[in-house]
Amino acid sequence: LKMGAMFVLLLLFTLASSHREGDIQARKTHLKSDFYRTLPRFARGCTISCGYEDNRCQGECHCPGKTNCYCTSGHHNKGCGCAC
């Protein structure tokens, strides 16, 4: 009887521990996707005159139907582009 009780307790502890690890991993994934969602993405179909000046991406960009567009260096894309 003692061995059975010990086995059940060990099994419950193992299940609870793996559930906690899954929750932590899910939270990390959620935070990571939130982080990447906030990074600027290059806009398409814009008139761009962006370039590097003093090691900063600067210039003007005009995107039809969009406001608050600006020159920026993208996260995945190398170079200087337009984000809105």
Swiss-Prot record:
UniProt main location, coarse: secreted
UniProt KW keywords: Disulfide bond, Neurotoxin, Secreted, Signal, Toxin
Annotated signal sequence range: 1-19
Entry GO CC: extracellular region
Propeptide residue span(s): 20-44
Annotated localization: Secreted
Post-translational modification: Contains 5 disulfide bonds.
Presence of the UniProt keyword Signal in the record: yes
Sample GO molecular function, one term: toxin activity
UniProt tissue specificity: Expressed by the venom duct.
Similarity comment: family membership: Belongs to the conotoxin S superfamily.
Domain free text: The cysteine framework is VIII (C-C-C-C-C-C-C-C-C-C).
The protein, known as: Conotoxin Tx8.1
Lineage: Eukaryota, Metazoa, Spiralia, Lophotrochozoa, Mollusca
